[in-house]
Amino acid sequence: MPDLLLLGLIGALTLLLLLTLLAFAGYSGLLTGVTVSAGSPPIRNITVAYKFHVGSYGDTGHLFTESCSISPKLRSIAVYYDNPHTVPPEKCRCAVGSILSEGEESPSPELIHLYQKFGFKIFSFPAPSHVVIATFPYTTPISIWLAARRVHPALDTYIKERKLCAHPRLEIYHQDKIHFMCPLARQGDFYVPEVKETERKCRELAEATDTQTDGTGADTSDASSVSLDVRPGSRETSATTLSPGAGNRGWDDGDNRSEHSYSESGASGSSFEELDLEGEGPLGEPRLNPEAKLLGPPRELSTPERGEE
């Protein structure tokens, strides 16, 4: 009899533990549906303090911790420029930091000086008219791990199915939500100067490799195959506890094309101007029709083109 009682007690405790783990996972967002849409951005123009990082996105946790420790009340932000599924981890680029101000408000000189004292740089991002957006609960450290494996694949699918030009990837941590945002306009204004510098170096390396290949008749380096063609464009805007990055990111990308940066994956896609609007969202913002397609009839091939076929 005592043995049966002991076994029953062990079984009850095991069941209670499983129910607790399931409840914790559900609270972290395991059962939360991921809805991706296009519309107005969740934020206005912002000024951020950031540090640039080249390497695995899973190694950015200390940057989140550092920025949060300086001013815990500020929202954290991360901007990811490369697709970690196609770019080697040691070459992935991102900017991590805190949002100092939003809209017409300017950050205080004291706050700017404080972040600069710890090696952060100051930069401004505009508010694009349209973005691809998604949200996910931010309640526990597990939420970050779940978001990396559920939201990013959903964003990839949404963008590729509609052939959108949406880059780079932004994550904004605000209270109990993680806001994911991919600009559909003014993308170049979201590229910090360090990205342009690394792109310039990659371009110079590719040109040097091409020159060496032309001179020897054989390709002696594969450096040109990994050059990142970001094309950030010209900027119109400039400016002189949980660790969100602690979760190891495992973004899924089923496409087997040779894209590297997010800008390359959508370089041939359409912008929001080529899509039909579905109407207004719950806050009055315009929404894009999920079934929208490119406007215009298919182009007839000219005579030379037919001849080539």
Swiss-Prot record:
GO terms for biological process: protein-DNA covalent cross-linking repair; reticulophagy. SUPFAM superfamilies: Probable bacterial effector-binding domain. A motif (LIR motif) lies at residues 272-275. The modification Phosphoserine is found at residues 238, 243. It comes from the Eukaryota. Residues 250-262 have a biased composition (Basic and acidic residues). This is Testis-expressed protein 264 homolog. Residues 25-309 are cytoplasmic. Interacts (via the LIR motif) with ATG8 family proteins MAP1LC3A, MAP1LC3B, GABARAP and GABARAPL1. Interacts with VCP/p97; bridging VCP/p97 to covalent DNA-protein cross-links (DPCs). Interacts with TOP1 (when sumoylated). Residues 193-309 are annotated as: Disordered. Residues 208-225, 263-272 have a biased composition (Low complexity). One of its GO terms (cellular component) is cytosol. Keywords: Autophagy, Chromosome, Cytoplasm, Cytoplasmic vesicle, DNA damage, DNA repair, Endoplasmic reticulum, Membrane, Nucleus, Phosphoprotein, Transmembrane, Transmembrane helix. Its main location: endoplasmic reticulum. GO terms for molecular function: signaling receptor activity. Major reticulophagy (also called ER-phagy) receptor that acts independently of other candidate reticulophagy receptors to remodel subdomains of the endoplasmic reticulum into autophagosomes upon nutrient stress, which then fuse with lysosomes for endoplasmic reticulum turnover. The ATG8-containing isolation membrane (IM) cradles a tubular segment of TEX264-positive ER near a three-way junction, allowing the formation of a synapse of 2 juxtaposed membranes with trans interaction between the TEX264 and ATG8 proteins. The chain crosses the membrane at residues 4-24. Coiled coil: none annotated. Residues 1-3 are lumenal. InterPro entries: Reg_factor_effector_dom_sf. It is found in: Endoplasmic reticulum membrane; Cytoplasmic vesicle, Autophagosome; Cytoplasm, Cytosol; Nucleus. It is a single-pass type III membrane protein. It comes from Mus musculus. The gene is Tex264. The LIR motif in the cytosol-facing C-terminal region is involved in the interaction with ATG8 proteins.
